[in-house]
Each structure stands twice: as C-alpha cells, then as structure tokens.
Swiss-Prot record:
Biased composition (Acidic residues): 165-175
Protein purpose: Required for bone modeling during late embryogenesis. Regulates type I collagen synthesis in osteoblasts during their postnatal maturation.
Protein's UniProt name: SUN domain-containing ossification factor
Biased composition, class Basic and acidic residues, residue ranges: 241-253
Glycosylation sites: N202, N236, N524, N928, N955
Gene that specifies this protein: SUCO
Bridged cysteine pairs (disulfide): none
PTM notes: O-glycosylated. O-mannosylated by POMT1 and POMT2 and elongated by POMGNT1.
Chain positions covered by the region annotation Disordered: 58-88, 118-270, 282-304, 530-553, 583-605, 759-788, 1152-1172
Transmembrane segments: 1011-1031
Membrane topology, as annotated: Single-pass type I membrane protein
Residues modified to Phosphoserine: S1081
Length: 1254
C-alpha cells in the first residue's frame, strides 16, 4: 500500500509540474493579464503578434518626441527605400479613403500610457534596439481590439473616423500629438489622433477638399487652446506649428458680424415715407412763420388791388347794356366829377360793364357827386366770364352811405378767396335802393379793382413763393403747406404727384389771400344793413356737390336772431324780383334759378374744382369742407372775422332781425339791417298771407306798428331786387348775428333749413325777420331772460308749399352738412326760425348752430344787444359810419355769402388763369424734383457710406483671409514634413516589427524545446528516485531482520588478550550500524600481527576529539588499515591484497560490499579517489594480509547509484544509509573475525575511526 500511495503522489507531482512549465504560457502571457489575453486570442500566433506589436509600440513611443530640427535632420538622413515610398503612398490613399468614406463605427484602441519623451531618439533601428525590444518584459502586454484592417493592410496605418474628426481641430490650429489626453496612445497600426488629423488635413488640402469655414476654424482654435493637453506630450514640431498658428490667428481674428454687410443704423426709408417725414417737419416750421409771411404779402396785395382800375375807359372798358331809362351810361367809366349817368329813381337801374381784361375782383368803388339827388343805398353786383349769359354769379349786395364822395367796397380777402381763382370780365350792377326822396338817382363813377392773370402770377411768385423759398432756401427745396396731404394719396412717381402738388400750391395762394382774417378784418369792418341775414347751417355745404346750387339770390333765408321770425322762401315766379329779372334781357328770374342750378351742378361735377375745394378746405379748421365749393371756406373765414370784430367793438345795435342764408356754416350778423330789405320782406309776407314763426324776446312787446309799417314799406320797395339783395343781406346779417346769438340761447333749425332750401332756388325768405328786427332789438335790450316765438302768419299757401318742397329736397343734404358743421366749425351758429311745418327738421341744425354761436359771442353779446334797442335807422347810420371805416366788411361778407351758394366757386375754378395753372404745375414739379433730389442725395450718401464700410470690411476680410491662407500654407508645409518624417519612421517601424516577429518566433521555438528537455529530465529523475526508494525499502527491511537476530549472539566474544566490556560491545555494535568515518588508515604489518592477535578498530568516540564530532562526517577522514604489503587499487573501488583470499569459507555469505555513502572531497571520474573512498573500515588480523582485499564485484545497481551521486551536487553532505548485504545475509561475528573464519571486507561495519593498535 505504501508503494502505491507513493507512486500516486509522484504522478500527481509530475502532472502539476508539467502544467506549471507549459511553454506557451511562459512565452505569451502576462502575469496579471493572462486570462484576458487568452480570451482575446485563441492562437499562439496571435499572442506572439500582439507581443511584437506592443514591444514595437513601446519602442516607437520612446522615439516619439523629436525636436523639429532633429526631426528635419533625421528625416533628411533617413534612407527611404522604394518600398517605403510605396508605403507612404498607400498611407495617403488610405487616409483619403477614410476621410471620404468615414468608416462607420469607430474602433477605439486603448493602449498603455507611455511617456513620449523617453530616451532612444534614434530614428535608425540597430541591433541594440532589437535586443531591447526582444528583451522587454512580456508581462506588459495589454488587450487590444483586433481589427480586420490590420491584417489586410499589414503595417499601413488606418485612420478611423473618430480620430480624424477629433483631430481636425488640432490640425487646423497646428496642434500636435496630445499624449496627456491620451490615455489612448496609438500603436503602429493607429497613429496618434492629432497626427492622423494633420495627415488628413494635409492630404485634403493638397486635393482642395478642405471645407472648414473661418468661423469654425476660430471656434476650433479657441476650443483647442482651452482644452489643449499637456504640451510635454506633443511633438515639438507640432507645438511650433500651434504657436505660430495661434500668433497669426489672434491678430487676424475675423468677427463674423464684421465680415457681414454693415447695417446702416437706420434703414433707408422709401421715398414716400421719407417725403412724409420731411413734409411734416417743414410744415411745422412754415406754420409758425406763415402768419407773418401772409401779413406782408397781404399788404402788398392790397396795394396792388387799388392800383389798376379795370373799369376805366382808358384801358378799354365799356358799358355793354343798361336799363332803357339810363342816360350817359359811359360817363361812369370816366374819371370826371361833372359827368354822370342819370336815371329816375322810380325805375329799375342796372347796367353791364365789360372790363378791359379778365381780372379777379378785389374792390369796387362807387360815387355820386351830384348834390340834389338821391344817392345809391343798396346795390347788387353780379359777375360773369362771358356775355351775354344767364348765369350771372352774384358777387354780393353792397350797402352804400349817404355821402357825396367815392365809397369803396373792398372785398374781404377770406370771403373773396373763393373767387380768387375766378377771372371775370363782365360785371352787372343793379341798384336796389337809395337814400333820400329825390327824383333822380345819378351815378358819377364806378371803379373795379382786381388782379389780372399776369399780376396774379407776379404777386404769388414774388411775394408768397419767394417768401416761402427764403424760408426753405437753406434746405434747397420748397413745397406748399399741406403739400404732404395731397402727396400722401398721390401717385409715387414724380409726374403722378404733379397734379396734387399744383392743387396744394393753389391752396397756398388761397391761404395767403384769405387766411389772415384777424389782422385785416379790423380795417375792413362794415356792418351789413340788409335785413336778410344768411344763417347758413353748416350742412348745406355738402349739398352743392351732389345737387344743383341755385344762384345766391334764391338761396337766402331770413332769420331773426331775437324775433326769429321764420322766413318762407318765395317762389321765383311770385317774387317781383324774378319778374324784373325776366324783364331784363340779361337775366330772367325763373330761368336764372333753374339755369344757375344746372350750370352750377355741371360746374361742380368737374373733379378739378372739387380738388381745389378740398385744398381750400384743408387749411380752415373751423369749416366743413365741401369738395367742390371752396367759397364756403372763405365764408367761414369771414364769419370768424366778423366775430373778432364784434368782440373788438364796445357796443352794437341789435334791433334788427337776422336772416340766415342756407349757406355753409357762416353766420353773418347784420347789426344794421337795411329797411328797404325788411320792407319787401314784410310786404311779401302780407301779400302772401303766410303765417310764420319767429323767435322774439319777451322782455318787451313787439315794436310799434309804425316800425312794422316802415319795414313793410321798405320791403315793398326792395321786392324787385330781392333775390340778389337777400344774398347780400344774408351775408351782412350773418356777421352781425353771431354776436347777438349768444344772448339768445334759442335758435331754431328752421333758418338753417330755409337756408338749405335757399340753396335750392328760394327767393327772399329772410326779409320777414328784418321787418321785426327793430322792435325785437329794443325788446332784447329790456330783458334777455326769456325768449318767445311769436308767429306771423302769411296767407299764401304757395309759400308754405314751396318751403315744404325745399325742405324735402334739402333735408338729406342739410343733415349731412349739419354733421360736418358740428364737427368742423364749432364757433359759428346759424340762427333760424323754424316754420310750423318745417320746424322739426330744422331744429337739429339750429341747435348745433346755437351752441357754436353762443360759445363764440359770449363776450360781445350784451353790449351789442343794447345797441340793437335803437331804431333801425340809427343802427343803419352807425353801420354806415362803421362801414366807412371798415370799408364795408359786412358787405364783403354778404357778397361772400352770395358765393356760398357754390355757383360762383365753380365758375371761378374753371376760370383759373393759364399762368397760374402753369405756375402751379411748375411749382409742384419743382417741389417734387427738389424732394426727389434731396432724397436721392441722402440716399446716395447713405449708399456711399455703406459702400465705404463694406469696402473696409471687405479689405479687412481679404487681409485676414490672406493671413489665414498664409498660416494654412505654412502649417500645411510643416505638417507635410512631419508626415513625411512619420512615414519614414513608420517604414522603420515596419521593418522592426518584421524582425521582431521572426525573433519572437525563433525564441518561442527555442524555449519550447528547452522546456521539453526539462520536462523529460524531470520525469527521468522522478522515475529513478522512485526505483531507488523501492530498492532501499526492500533491503532495509531484510537487513534489519537479520542483523537484529544475530547481533546478540555476537555481542560477547572471547578475547585472548583483552576482554571487551558489554559497553564497548554495545558501542561497537552501534558504531557498526553506521558508516564509518574516514580516518587515517591503521597500518598493520603482517610480521607483527599474528593470526591469533586481535586488532580492534576503536570507534571515534573513544577519542575525546572524535567523540564530539560523531555526526560531522564531512570534515573527518577515515583512517584505513593498510596491510604490510601494498594494495593494488581496483577499478571497482575494492582494495585487495597481493594474495587473494583463499579461505572461501570465511565471508562466504557476503555477496556485496557497500561502501559508505559519504563522499570525500570531490574527485569525480578518477578511479584512485574512488578506490580511496571505498577503503574498508576494518582490517583483519595482521597475519592475514588480505584481510581487507577480499571484496566482491559491485552490481550494476551500485554502479548506477554511484554515477548519480557524482552528478548531483546538492546530495553532498547528506548521509545515506547504505544497505549492507552479505551473501550469507548476516554480519560475521566477532568470534569469527578473531578466528579468521570469515573474510571481513571494507564497509562491513560502519566505524568512524580506528584508534591505534589494540
């Protein structure tokens, strides 16, 4: 069992040893990563290749950091073979392929971090580098992902997309290898990321494939500068590139915003927008200076007006027609006080004058120098541009004074502005009433002042145009006020806006002529004494555009501001005026009404006049503008003038009724009412028997019937001229009414309605109110608290019917106009008395008028009412005196009201002078061209600035691009050099790898062989040891048994000379069981020794020195007993005498002689030393010379063991128990030895030493 267990243990040990000494693991595996390596590679070849790659990589990394200069030198010194060139080309091609194809998932290779700045910078590979590589520890191998590309391309580097993309930034900036980032250090298969990127950039730039933009370049530069790795880990050449590129990049940084087209701080506006802004600014400037400029121009115009008399015989004027009773009609055209035209006062006096040239009427002068005659009191003036005609336009009713000198009637600029554009050549004058009761009514002189076409052009061009030009001259352009209002809607081209510009110029002229009411009206103040005050509700202004406008004769309506007696329009057929007009060849009243309406309607239809009307309206904020009636605007102006005058006055007599024409919202208060006008009105009322309501003041009873009779008489006289007279009265009355209306809060719409009706041909409706004005004014002065509406009845139904028709026709237009008037003209009010039938429709208009009038005339109302208490005659006288100073401003206002019908305006628009049209067009074009030129100049300046800025930016961009290109070229050149150097290094590395592969294969083979030999030797040793162990076990067991059984018998043996004690025997027995130490041999001569003598070999213990060193076998030497005769050594180590043992009986049982296992000093291979080492420890009796020579031959086993002891040095110093075996199987007893029965051989007893002779 023991043998089997030992054999099993040995076999297991052998198996373990074979596993531990497996050759492949010792060659390919790292101690710490053997498992991982085995998982990646299943073949020894892959492991070997990996080992080679890693070793080569380390070598390459050691040689990595090379200075730019050293790189250049080494690169130039390196020999490049054609194969290397081919490798370079292949690497470039591969890089291009990777750049274009962009390999899908990038393969990351993790390699151990190695300092690139280690030693060994030699580029040439020598044998030492190979040895170093081969001797590098194999335990530093790390797992690397295996790429198919490596096997395919061999040693050509493969650039992966991730590496190329990541390294583009470094390439752009000139950044080189970054080994700190790096815990990814490339092997020879995948070069460093930055180098790969540089290589790619170099290749792509050489082929013109670089697509990176400047902004990306800068961003990458900044990113790379911020996130740059350790500079120590980069190549010096790449660092130099980076530094240079950064130096160039910093001064040449291109700001993307700066490269872009510079934005103008303010976008260039379009021409229309720019023009609007400019016009608004200039309008504000011009408005502040407009009043002063208008004042100066107005004064000059006045002078010019009075300069030329166009009704003079000297310039060619003549009388075209007159009433049949007239005598010496041409005398009025001659400046001679002794000549006059004579007419009886009982006849209707009229005449027609042809002026020497078409003019714009500005002033009329009339004179009667004859002492005993009646002077003209009221006369009606009509104008026309052609003759004969039935479309006489009523210029107005003029109220003269009872004087014997020239009386001037200047036309108010504002009111007459409606006619500024109308050039007329024919004037018709009708005398309506006269002062005194003389039989004859002579007329000595009549003058007409105005402005011809040429003068108009000169006035505007010299005064207004130049003044405006001076104001705007600094800006090198001029334009009319409100020019932008027309331009906003005008066409965008220059020619398209010419029309609007011309209209705007016309508006300027109108403003200049009529805008300054406050300054000039003071001198032109005149109180109209006509009883008919035209209370024009604001509404009728719009009607003329759509409906025919009758002549101003028929438009007038009567209104009493205090009495407020409703005036009903008399039909033109019934009115005597109409009949008188019919009698006249020039105009028939009924036909005049219809023709005027149609003619005016036709004229109004023309867009030209409508546009002009809009122009005039634009400047007057208090006026409701009707598109085709510019005269309405001027009526409003005249009303404002009258209001200012009334405020300036301290007291005005208001004992008069006020008639309001159905004109635009102009209110003309007539403080002095002509009795003649009132009389025909009352007369008509009585004749017609029509009931009429009028507002009256309750404070006092109506004036005495005498006043009414007087008024009636006057009205009867004036009935014939009433239609035209009513217009004039209405204007004058409106001027006077406004101050008085304030005290009278109640004003009814009837007047306004009537006024509107008046637009439709309605003869003198307002005359009724004039009849009652005197009484009412007196009553007003007494008490203002209450107002009543006394009614006066007219018995004629026709008048009521006519009013109804008129109202129906005009209600719509009235409503429209009222709205306009309410919104536009608050200050002006129309005092109208509603008829019973028409009261409701008229109330709305009247209410609005009341509010405006009350607000305007609060201050002047009280004193004016007091004056109205006076008799109408006194009022008329005051009015005359006042008109003398004021040049009959009210009369002028009344004339303007007459034009308010719209007929005059229309004709005037048509008759605008050709010069003015051309002038306006020219001015408009000049303004347009000026604005265009200015705009273009500004535009060109902006464009030039932008171009300059763009040029500067472009130059900067070019410079920066040049710098960038230069930097790129330098960088590219350096990268090319670096790439060439790297390619050379790559070629060398390839060679090294091939050499290393061969060397590694050879080493692997050698190591495998060596390991195989070691394993075989180990097996043999184990087998031999096993055999020896088995043999020893067997021999030891046998020897022990025999020896123990025989030893007690031989303990006691007789000695002839000496007896050994039991102790000595025990010692001897014990000593013999162990090998004997070598000692000096005891020489016994045969002569001295008898056979019977006993020689005792004494153990070392008997010697005190040897006794202490029982166990130190190596140091002691065994003394051999030498016989007297010399011994001959035998090859086997047995010592034999000269004579062999003859006694076969003795020692016959000893089959083998074992020598001590102790070896003396090493003397391997010599037979002498072996024989000496095998010296016997016992020697026989001296007599037996061959006592120690009778050893038997050694067996083969003993010889083999002897050889093994020689070969193994580690077994020295160990005591091996020898198995002593004899042929007999037992040791010779002492007795036998003594007797010499048996032969004792060396090694039979293990005695350490023999001490001397016994």
């Amino acid at each position: 069992m023991k043998k089997h267990r030992r054999a099993l243990a040995l076999v297991s040990c052998l198996f373990l040893c074979s596993l531990v000494w497996l050759p492949s693991w010792r060659v390919c595996c790292k101690e710490s990563s053997s498992a991982s390596a085995s998982s990646y590679y299943s073949q020894d070849d892959n492991c070997a290749l990996e080992n080679e790659d890693v070793q080569f990589q380390k070598k390459d990394e050691r040689e990595g950091p090379i200075n730019a200069e050293s790189l250049g030198k080494s690169g130039s010194n390196l020999p490049i073979s054609p194969k290397e060139h081919k490798l370079k080309d292949d690497s470039i091609v591969d890089v291009q392929n990777t750049e274009s194809k962009k390999l899908s998932p990038p393969v990351v290779e993790t390699l151990p971090t190695v300092d690139l700045h280690e030693e060994s910078s030699n580029a040439v590979v020598d044998s030492e580098t190979v040895e170093n590589i081969s001797s590098s520890s194999t335990s530093e191998i790390t797992p690397i992902s295996k790429l198919d590309e490596i096997e395919k391309s061999g040693t050509i580097p493969i650039a992966k997309p991730s590496e190329t993309e990541q390294s583009e930034t470094d390439c752009d900036v000139g950044e080189a290898l970054d080994a700190s980032a790096p815990i990814e250090q490339p092997s020879f298969v995948s070069p460093p990321d930055s180098l790969v990127g540089q290589h790619i950039e170099n290749v792509s730039s050489s082929h013109g494939k670089g697509k990176i933009t400047k902004s990306e370049f800068e961003s990458k530069v900044s990113a790379s500068e911020q996130g740059g790795g350790d500079p120590k880990s980069a190549l010096n050449a790449s660092d130099n590139l980076k530094n240079e590129s950064s130096d160039y990049t910093k001064p040449g940084d291109i700001d993307p915003t700066s490269v872009a087209s510079p934005k103008d701080p303010e976008d260039i506006p379009t021409f229309d927008e720019w023009k609007k802004k400019v016009m608004e600014v200039e309008k504000e400037k011009s408005q502040s200076m407009h009043a002063s400029s208008n004042g100066g121009s107005h004064a000059t115009k006045k002078v010019q007006k009075n300069r030329n008399n166009y009704a003079s015989v000297e310039c060619g004027a003549k009388i075209l027609a007159a009433n049949p009773e007239a005598k010496s009609t041409s005398a009025i055209l001659i400046e001679n006080m002794d000549l006059y035209m004579l007419n009886p006062c009982s006849t209707k006096i009229w005449f027609v004058i042809e002026l020497c040239e078409p003019i714009q009427v500005k002033q009329l002068d009339i004179a009667n120098y004859e002492l005993f005659s009646s002077t003209p009191k009221d006369f009606l003036v009509s104008i026309s541009d052609r003759y004969p005609t039935n479309k006489w336009i009523k210029l107005g009713t003029f109220h003269g004074r009872d004087e014997r000198n020239v009386q001037s009637f200047p036309l108010d600029e504002q009111m007459y502005a409606k006619y500024v554009k109308m050039f007329i050549k024919y004037i018709k004058v009708e005398l309506l009433s006269h002062f005194g009761s003389e039989h004859f009514c002579p007329l000595s002189l009549i003058r007409v002042f105005g402005t011809s076409m040429v003068e108009e052009y000169e006035e505007i061009a010299d005064s207004q145009y130049h003044s405006e030009r001076q104001e705007l001259f600094d800006e090198d352009y001029d334009y009319p006020l409100d020019y932008n209002t027309g331009e906003d809607k005008s066409s965008k081209n220059l020619l398209g806006s010419a029309t609007n510009a011309i209209l705007n110029m016309v508006n300027i002229a109108a403003n200049i002529l009529g805008a300054k009411t406050e300054d000039l009206t003071e001198g032109n103040k005149s109180i109209s004494e006509n009883a008919t005050a035209t209370a024009a509700p604001k509404m009728p202004e719009s009607t003329p555009v759509s409906t025919p406008v009758p002549s101003p004769e028929y438009v007038t309506t009567e209104v009493h501001t205090h009495d407020m007696e409703p005036s009903t329009p008399d039909t033109p057929k019934e009115s005597p005026i109409v009949q008188l007009v019919q009698e006249e060849e020039e105009e028939a009243s009924p036909s005049t009404v219809t023709l005027l309406g149609s003619g005016e309607q036709e004229d109004e239809s023309s867009p030209w006049f409508e546009s002009e009307t809009q122009i005039f309206c634009s400047e007057l904020t208090t006026i409701c503008c009707i598109s085709s009636f510019s005269e309405y605007i001027y009526k409003w102006c005249s009303v404002r003038v009258a209001l200012y005058r009334q405020r300036s006055r301290t007291a005005l007599s208001k004992g008069k009724d006020y008639l309001v024409l159905a004109q635009p919202p102009l209110l003309l208060p007539a403080e002095s009412v002509d009795v003649s006008v009132l009389q025909p009105l009352s007369g008509e009322l009585e004749n017609t028997n029509i009931e009429r309501e009028a507002e009256t003041v309750v404070l006092g009873d109506l004036s005495s019937s005498m006043h009414q009779d007087d008024l009636v008489n006057h009205t009867v006289d004036a009935v014939e001229l009433e239609p035209s007279h009513s217009q004039t009265l209405s204007q004058s009355l409106l001027l006077d009414i406004t101050p008085e209306i304030n005290p009278l809060p109640k004003i009814e719409v009837s007047e306004s309605v009537e006024y509107e009706a008046g637009h439709i041909p309605s003869p003198v409706i307002p005359q009724e109110s004039s009849v009652e004005i005197d009484n009412e004014t007196e009553q007003k002065s007494e008490s203002f608290s209450s107002i009543e509406k006394p009614s006066i009845t007219y018995e004629t139904n026709k008048v009521n019917e006519l009013m109804d028709n008129i109202i129906k026709e005009d209600v719509n237009s009235m409503q429209i106009f009222t709205k306009l008037s309410e919104t536009i003209v608050p200050p002006i009010n129309t005092a109208t008395v509603p008829d019973n039938e028409d009261g409701e429709a008229k109330m709305n208009i009247a209410d609005t008028a009341k509010q405006t009038l009350i607000s305007v005339v609060d201050s002047s109302s009280l004193p004016e009412v007091k004056e109205e208490e006076q008799s109408p005659e006194d009022a008329l006288l005051r009015g005359l005196q006042r008109t003398a100073t004021d040049f009959y401003a009210e009369l002028q206002n009344s004339t303007d009201l007459g034009y308010a019908n719209g007929n005059l305006v229309h004709g005037s628009n048509q008759k605008e002078s050709v010069f003015m049209r051309l002038n306006n067009r020219i001015k408009a074009l000049e303004v347009n061209m000026s604005l265009s030129g200015r705009y273009l100049e500004e535009l060109s300046q902006r464009y030039r600035k932008q171009m300059e800025e763009m040029q500067k930016a472009f130059n900067k961009t070019i410079v920066k691009l040049q710098n960038t290109s230069r930097i790129a070229e330098e960088q590219d050149q350096r990268q090319t050099e670096a790439i060439q150097l790297l390619q050379a290094q790559l070629t060398n590395m390839t060679q090294l790898v091939s050499n290393l592969s061969a060397t590694v294969a050879e080493l692997k083979r050698e190591v495998s062989d060596r390991q195989s030999y070691l394993v075989i030797s180990l097996v043999l040793c184990v087998v031999l040891g096993l055999m020896l162990c088995m043999q020893r076990c067997r021999n030891t067991s046998q020897f022990d048994g025999d020896y123990i059984s025989k030893l007690p018998k031989s303990n006691q043996y007789p000695s002839p000379k000496r007896c050994f004690s039991s102790y000595d025997d025990m010692n001897l027995k014990r000593r013999t069981s162990f090998p004997l130490m070598r000692s000096k041999s005891l020489q016994l001569t045969g002569k001295e020794v008898d056979p019977n003598d006993l020689y005792i070999v004494e153990p070392l213990k008997f010697s005190p020195e040897k006794k202490k060193k029982r166990c130190k076998y190596k140091i002691e030497k065994i003394e051999t007993i030498k016989p007297e005769e010399p011994l001959h050594p035998i090859a086997n180590g047995d010592i034999k005498g000269r004579k062999p043992f003859t006694n076969q009986r003795d020692f016959s049982n000893m089959g083998e002689v074992y020598h001590s296992s102790y070896k003396g000093p090493p003397s391997e291979g010599s037979s002498e030393t072996s024989s000496q080492s095998e010296e016997s420890y016992f020697c026989g009796i001296s007599a037996c010379t061959s006592l120690c020579n009778g050893q038997s031959q050694k067996t083969k086993t003993e010889k083999r063991a002897l050889k093994r002891r020689r070969s193994k040095v580690q077994d020295q110093g160990k005591l091996i128990k020898t198995l002593i075996q004899t042929k007999s199987g037992s040791l010779p007893s002492l007795h036998d030895i003594i007797k010499g029965n048996k032969e004792i051989t060396v090694g039979t007893f293990g005695v350490t030493a023999v001490s001397g002779h016994i």
